[in-house]
From Swiss-Prot:
Keywords: DNA damage, DNA repair, DNA synthesis, DNA-binding, Magnesium, Metal-binding, Mitochondrion, Nucleotidyltransferase, Nucleus, Transferase. Its cofactor is Mg(2+). The gene is REV1. Signal peptide: none annotated. Residues 319-329, 395-397, 554-557, 620-628 are annotated as: Interaction with target DNA. This is DNA repair protein REV1. Residues 358-554 form the UmuC domain.
């Protein structure tokens, strides 16, 4: 009774239930409960069933299958008891007050319809074990049916816009509210939201509605979106989802944030004169507003402006949908994959013996041009050639993705904030901000590449980006290459692309090397072409470019070149001042040679790989996501969930390209100590310190459990507090194609237990396929006796499942002998055998076995270091390799030199050198043995030779040479023996 006493009523109705039960086994109930919970987790958790099963070890998987099959048997043949309940007529004060009647209300009629539809199954329910989980599951199912009936009843009276106001919102109402609970329930359901009658887990709810909260509830709901009922009322009235922050009950306003004193709220909704609802009535329900009172709203814009918290399951989807860089990287990767999979076999392979011309083609401010051509009617008055135009998400602190050349003439650049760009414009000039049109960007890019293929004048088309390509044309030996021919080709290409993209212009750089084609492209912009070959290079050409116009020259390299060569202003100045040796000394050998060749108009070997072996250069080598906006976590649990979602997203992409990964990398951006908690850019990253950590997985894999667990472990090794985290990147490196031989390195140990066919057939149908697939993945075959590894069928690869002593298996002769004994003696013998067996199974037997293993280990260690079968390379001293003979030699050496003025200096150096070699090969224990030997000899001869100079010399050698050597290498000795010591005489 105690387990069901706290159940929450779904519709404030009275439940009468009676339990007819026998006394069940408590342990059995607990085990069944745990299996049910794990089954529920596998079905409805954050991971799918396959991911859940893959995280289990072999033994855990078998135990889970056996318990689940046993639970399923018990549920199909109940013995513990049954629960019978009946639902009375629904009537409450709030229902009459808000809707004007009991059974005529839409919710009451919905419940009655559900009861009538379920009346035929009452006999089945009486004979079923009714658990707490089943009760809440049926409640949730009944709620879903009730809400669907309500929506179907008024679907013709609700506009498509207002029916999506609360899309993706899961709302729970806490306590008394005005309007009432049922009225708010109607508003939520009829306008696209989901209503929760009970709060089983706060993770499932997005908003909590309450009129007032006590202190305890305020603390409990401090990290959740708790709003007043006016938020629902005003959102329905405005026909759009209003910011919940304006209606928050728990959040405290920032000191710098102004309070909204003049915020207009609505306490009630204007209702029709008739509130009773009949099937034939034309009036709308109390949760609906007349259509003419609803202001039109663009749902696309509403969704675009919706901000999703980083702990929301839809955060990654929302983030990538609005990320320009994500679209760029995805399109670029798709272009390269398409080139490798479809077009590479169609192109001519280029060699170093071919004569070719490079056409480097690039759009002029691609995003700004496409956004202008596809602009809405509200921007129809702007002129692309006269007005400064930028493409961005919003205003103020939004980053500028692209700008036209008019805006660039005022100093505006890509990546600049809109507010900063507006300050650079003179008075009277207004900056025009156009939104992203990702679909049009992709269409224009596809038209660009299809036009290049249709021209059929190139032997190779290499995709660099969605708006940039390198095209190669091989010149036959019998055709003379002229600038006139190349100029005609450039004009033809530009004209065809302009027509194919409906108004987008491109610039072309034409040359006989990649680096010169790139520089010529820079000179040709905007909307032009330039033809420059190695044979006609001039000082005027080199004077047109800055140092960072060369490929591979960034900010760091630029500063080194300026400091080394007296701040050259152009490439022509650098060509006059540099020498190859000075260049290599400044920026390194490899980069120095690359810059040297570029200044001669030539390509280095690494750059030429894209022409000679494009498959190797363009194939995907890594897969990653990088989130640096909206990252605000409260605890480690949220971070773990976010990492799991990121890994799941990357694994889906990894499986799409049919690859596995053998190395993963986690990169973090942690807020700087002196940086503000909230940066100027809303939900931005601000000033951060970057950290990264990589891990090798051993063998390539695409298992979620392995990768997600390792990623979370990497996060803990970096030690970043969740509240200080501002950016997070997950990366899969060393991608490998999935093949049949990938599992050759996997080692599968046999199960300690087995699953019988009977137990397997008793499993629930919804998980039987997943478990069977998991067994197939682990290379196990189902046999009549159970599940065993097919690796056991091979004697060469067989493993000993358990080590059985001979005495554990009674022979037939022993049984016959026991049967011939008298009854009393036979009983005594059996009793003694049982005692002996118990002794063997006690801790005493384990202790004796442990002592025996330790002695064997010490003997193996001795043989390992000093025996004839030692794996170490022998270290000689005086042409002796056996340590025992070396000890005898040292002992004799000490004894003979004590009374003779001590050892010779060169002999001491040779001896110390021998000791150092022992330490370097991790044989410090041998050095310790020699030091003890010398110390022991000195102690024995102290009475006779303590006044001799030889005795003092050996003491000095021991104190100044041998003991310090031991202390410097004591960590090796401590690591093996777990000791903490200092060596002293």
């Amino acid at each position: 009774m105690g387990e069901h006493g706290g159940l929450v009523d779904l519709l404030d109705s009275d439940l009468e239930y009676s339990i007819n039960r026998e006394t069940p086994d408590k342990n059995n109930c607990l085990s069944q409960q745990s299996v049910n919970d794990s089954h529920l987790t596998a079905k409805t958790g954050g991971l799918n069933a396959r991911s859940f099963l893959s995280t289990l070890s072999d033994d855990s998987l078998i135990e889970y299958v056996n318990q689940l099959s046993q639970t399923n048997k018990n549920n199909s043949n109940p013995t513990a008891g049954t629960l019978r309940f009946t639902t009375k007529n629904i009537s409450c004060d709030e229902l009459h007050a808000d809707l004007g009647g009991g059974e005529d209300s839409p919710i009451a009629r919905s419940v009655i319809e559900i009861q009538e539809s379920d009346s035929n199954g009452d006999d089945v329910k009486k004979n079923t074990v009714y658990t707490r989980e089943a009760y809440f599951h049926e409640k949730a199912h009944g709620q879903t049916l009730q809400d669907q009936i309500l929506k179907d009843q008024y679907k013709d009276q609700i506009s498509s816009q207002s029916s999506k106001i609360f899309k993706n919102c899961v709302i729970y109402i806490n306590g008394y509210t005005k309007p009432g609970r049922l009225q708010l329930h109607e508003m939520i359901v009829l306008h696209g939201g989901k209503f929760l009658h009970y709060l089983s887990s706060k993770k499932t709810v997005t908003h909590i509605v309450a009129s007032n909260l006590p202190l305890k509830k305020r603390i409990e709901f401090a990290n959740y979106k708790v709003v007043s009922p006016d938020w629902i009322v005003d959102s329905v009235k405005e026909a759009r989802l209003l910011p919940w922050q304006n209606y928050s009950l728990t959040s405290k306003l920032d000191e710098q944030q102004k309070k909204l004193d003049n915020c207009k709220t609505v306490n009630s909704i204007p209702l029709p004169s008739e509130t009773s609802l009949h099937k034939g009535s034309k009036c709308v329900g109390s949760a609906l507003l007349p259509v003419e009172q609803q202001s039109p709203v663009n749902l696309n814009n509403l969704e675009a402006k919706r901000i999703v918290a980083c702990d929301d399951p839809d955060f990654l989807t929302s983030y990538f949908a609005h990320s320009r860089l994500h679209h760029l990287s995805a399109w670029k990767a798709n272009l390269k994959d398409k080139f490798l999979n479809e077009n590479i076999h169609k192109y001519t392979k280029i060699t170093d013996k071919d004569t070719y011309i490079i056409f480097h083609i690039d759009f002029d401010c691609f995003f700004a041009t496409v956004a202008y051509l596809c602009r809405s009617s509200s921007f129809s008055a702007c002129d692309f050639k006269r007005d400064p135009i930028v493409v961005c998400h919003g205003t103020k602190n939004s980053d500028i993705a692209s700008c036209n050349y008019v805006a660039r003439s005022y100093g505006i650049k890509n990546g600049m904030w809109v507010s900063q760009a507006e300050k650079m414009l003179p008075n009277g000039i207004k900056l025009i901000s156009l939104p992203y049109t990702f679909e049009q960007f992709q269409l224009k890019s596809e038209a660009f590449y299809s036009t290049l293929k249709r021209l059929n004048i190139f032997n190779l088309i290499l995709p660099i980006s969605i708006d940039e390509a390198v095209c190669v044309r091989i010149i036959p030996d019998n055709i003379h290459n002229t600038n006139t021919l190349n100029a005609r080709l450039c004009e033809e290409i530009r004209q065809e692309i302009f027509q194919g993209t409906n108004g987008c212009t491109v610039s072309i750089g034409c040359s006989d090397s990649l680096v010169l084609a790139r520089l010529a492209l820079k000179m040709a912009k905007p909307n032009g072409y330039n033809i420059t070959f190695k044979s006609n290079l001039s000082e005027e050409f080199w004077s047109s470019f800055k140092l960072d116009d060369l490929p591979g020259v960034g900010h760091s390299t630029l500063s080194r070149l300026e400091s080394t060569f007296d701040s050259p202003h152009s490439l022509n100045d650098l060509r006059k001042r540099y020498t190859l040796d000075a260049l290599k000394a400044s920026v390194g050998s490899k980069l120095g040679m690359k810059i040297h060749l570029a200044l001669q108009g030539q390509d280095d070997e690494e750059s030429l790989k894209i022409l000679y072996d494009p498959k190797e250069v363009l194939q995907r080598k890594s897969l990653s996501i990088d989130i640096n906006w909206g990252i605000r976590f409260k605890n480690i649990t949220q971070v773990d969930l976010f990492i799991e979602r990121g890994c799941q997203y990357l694994l889906e992409k990894l499986n799409e390209i049919n690859k596995t990964t053998s190395q993963i990398t986690l990169k973090l951006m942690r807020r700087c100590k002196d940086a503000p908690i909230e940066p100027p850019k809303y939900m931005g990253m601000g000033r951060c310190d970057s950290f990264s950590r990589s891990s090798r997985l051993g063998i390539p894999t695409n298992e979620f459990g392995i990768i997600a667990t390792e990623m979370k472990s990497l996060y803990r090794t970096l030690g970043c507090p969740p509240m200080e985290l501002r950016g997070l990147a997950l990366q899969f490196n060393k991608l490998v194609d999935v093949g049949p031989d990938n599992n050759q390195l996997k080692l599968r140990l046999p199960f300690k237990t087995i699953v019988t066919n009977r137990a397997f057939e008793a499993l629930p149908e919804d998980v039987k396929n997943d478990i069977n697939n998991e067994f197939e993945k682990r290379n196990y075959k189902r046999k009549e006796s159970g599940l065993t590894s097919n690796s056991l069928s091979s004697k060469k690869k067989g493993f000993a499942i358990s080590r059985l002593e001979v005495n554990d298996l009674p022979s037939t002769m022993e049984e016959q002998f026991m049967n011939e004994l008298p009854t009393q003696i036979r009983a005594e013998v059996r009793h003694d055998l049982r005692i002996q067996k118990k002794i063997q199974q006690t801790k005493l037997g384990n202790l004796q076995e442990k002592i025996k293993r330790r002695e064997e280990s010490l003997q193996n260690e001795k043989n390992h270091f000093m025996g004839q079968n030692s794996i170490f390379q022998p270290i000689k001293f005086q042409n002796l390799t056996r340590f025992k003979k070396i000890c005898q030699l040292v002992k004799q050496w000490v004894a003979e030199t004590l009374g003779d003025g001590g050892p010779h200096e060169k002999d001491v150096k040779l001896f110390v050198k021998y000791l150092i070699k022992l330490c370097d090969s991790n044989r410090v224990h041998l050095v310790l043995h020699l030091s003890n030997l010398i110390s022991r000899e000195l102690n024995l001869c102290a009475f006779l030779n303590q006044d001799h100079s030889g005795f003092q010399t050996w003491e000095r050698i021991l104190l100044n040479d041998i003991i310090p050597l031991l202390n410097r290498n004591k960590h090796t000795y401590q690591t093996v023996r777990k000791l903490d010591m200092d060596f002293e005489v």
